[in-house]
Design a protein with these regions (language model features):
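Transmembrane helix-loop junctions at the membrane interface of multipass transporters and ion channels
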Residues: 11, 15-43, 227-232
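Juxtamembrane inter-helical linkers in multi-pass membrane proteins
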Residues: 67-92, 139, 182-194
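Alpha-helical transmembrane segments of multi-pass inner-membrane proteins
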Residues: 4, 9, 37-49, 53, ...
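Hydrophobic core segments of alpha-helical transmembrane domains in multi-pass membrane transport
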Residues: 25-28, 46-62, 108-120, 212-216
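Juxtamembrane helix-loop transition segments at the membrane interface in multi-pass membrane proteins
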Residues: 1-5, 9, 61-78, 225-232
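Long hydrophobic segments that form regular secondary structure
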Residues: 35, 62-71, 81-129, 147
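Hydrophobic alpha-helical transmembrane segments in multi-pass membrane proteins
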Residues: 13, 17-18, 22, 103-116, ...
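Extended, low-charge hydrophobic alpha-helical regions
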Residues: 1-5, 113-232
Length: 232
């Protein structure tokens, strides 16, 4: 039961997937309303889909040999509840903040640098160097080679595929990769809409955008989650 829970719990959207849900939700609603500001309404829907995916996956896995058998009894002894001290609260806050800073300063930063390099350099006329057209970049070559695999899902665009691939290292890097590929500069509040407008051109319809969102919701978790699952 513990292994089953570990494997299926990843279908529930984590905090790292919320920016992707907000971005793609805005893209999807723009097809119907013309506005990119209603994307937050997709979050409850994605959580509901995640819960359904957990139930379906658990039922299917329970019928397989590695997870079959009688459920093990679960006993948890809870200590008495106490009001936490300020020191304890601050220590827990610092641990979470430190973990995020380390993740943002290592995995996310390196992922953005790698995506920037791959999208800014490539081979033109037989020589390697900086490219003005992202379509001639190394990332376009890699994404274009893999894109046909994702074409049946509705997003055979190399930029969408590249953004999805970056999510395997950290889900937070999906939106940042979209920003890099969209060549966004300027005010951040305006950039959010500009990125969404650029991303919309990657998908032929709202269904394709939903397919992209659903794929990144239910695909393999990030490296940090996989390493934690292995330890458990």
């Amino acid at each position: 039961d513990r292994r089953l829970t570990i494997l299926t719990a990843t279908f529930i959207p984590c905090g790292a997937k919320l920016p992707v849900i907000a971005m793609m939700g805005g893209v999807m609603t723009s097809y119907a309303t013309g506005s990119y500001e209603a994307g937050g309404l997709m979050a409850p829907c994605m959580y509901f889909i995640g819960i359904v995916a957990v139930l379906v996956a658990a039922i299917i896995l329970k019928k397989t040999k590695p997870f079959s058998g009688k459920p093990a009894p679960f006993v948890m002894e809870l200590p008495q509840y106490h009001i936490p001290s300020a020191k304890t609260v601050l220590l827990h806050v610092w641990e979470r903040l430190k973990g995020f800073i380390i993740k943002a300063g290592t995995i996310l930063f390196l992922a953005c640098v790698v995506m920037w390099f791959l999208s800014g350099y490539g081979f033109v006329n037989g020589s390697f160097g900086a490219v003005e057209d992202p379509g001639n970049s190394l990332l376009a070559v890699i994404g274009g080679a893999i894109a046909p695999i994702f074409a049946p899902l509705g997003f055979g665009n190399w930029k969408a595929v590249a953004a999805s691939l970056s999510g395997f290292s950290a889900k937070e890097s999906i939106v940042s990769t979209m920003g890099v590929l969209a060549n966004i500069t300027g005010d951040a509040s305006e950039d959010a809409v500009t990125v969404a407008e650029a991303v919309r051109t990657w998908f032929p319809s709202a269904v394709a955008a939903f397919s992209f969102l659903l794929f990144n919701l239910l695909d393999s978790p990030c490296l940090a989650a996989i390493s934690t699952m292995a330890k458990e």
